[in-house]
């Protein structure tokens, strides 16, 4: 890789970012959103170099977070939408999660039941979803299999009923 400066002057460890490449990729992502109507979010678990968020902000709809602190980072440094998912949410964090999140993914119907009153009483619309385990994996090694018994990769389809899927129309307290 050819760099436009001498690496001899760098103090290590350090990160070197190709801002031009970041902007080119951002333009591609922005055009995909414009052409399809989809929203593309930055997965902070994979890339949380928040010093680059001001560069990426014009191209993306927001961020995803796997917990309260990632959600705060996304809200404060990137802005836009904040989508949060987690195998479990500490009850004491939930008021703050509701204050900064636009979409919350729950890992089970039990979690939704536990936290829905916070969502409903937060004073602004928050969309919610349930993470469904695909119950199918290409890998044979259990260590890498997201579908093994006891997995934290969402609920299986078996407990999902028509009532769950239509809950917003049939439960008065939702």
Task: Indicate where each model-derived feature is located.
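A charged N-terminal "starter" segment
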Residues: 1-109, 113-120, 124-126
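Conserved small/polar residues in nucleotide/adenosyl-binding loops
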Residues: 163-170
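Flexible, glycine/proline-enriched loop segments at strand-loop-helix junctions
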Residues: 13, 100-106, 144-157
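Conserved radical SAM core fold
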Residues: 49, 70, 91-93, 134-149
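Short beta-strand segments
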Residues: 127-133
């Amino acid at each position: 890789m050819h760099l436009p400066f001498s690496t001899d002057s760098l103090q290590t460890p350090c990160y070197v970012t190709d801002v031009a490449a970041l902007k080119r990729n951002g333009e591609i992502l922005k055009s995909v959103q414009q052409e399809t109507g989809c929203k593309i979010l930055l997965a902070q678990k994979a890339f949380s170099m928040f010093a680059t968020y001001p560069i990426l902000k014009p191209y993306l709809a927001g961020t995803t977070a796997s917990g309260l602190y990632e959600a705060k980072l996304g809200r404060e440094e990137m802005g836009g939408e904040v989508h949060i998912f987690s195998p479990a949410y500490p009850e004491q964090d939930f008021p703050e999660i509701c204050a900064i999140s636009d979409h919350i993914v729950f890992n089970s119907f039990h979690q939704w039941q536990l936290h829905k009153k916070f969502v409903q009483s937060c004073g602004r619309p928050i969309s919610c979803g349930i993470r469904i385990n695909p119950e199918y994996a290409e890998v044979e090694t259990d260590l890498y299999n997201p579908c093994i018994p006891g997995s934290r990769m969402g609920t299986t389809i078996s407990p999902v009923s028509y009532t769950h899927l239509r809950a917003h129309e049939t439960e008065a307290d939702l």
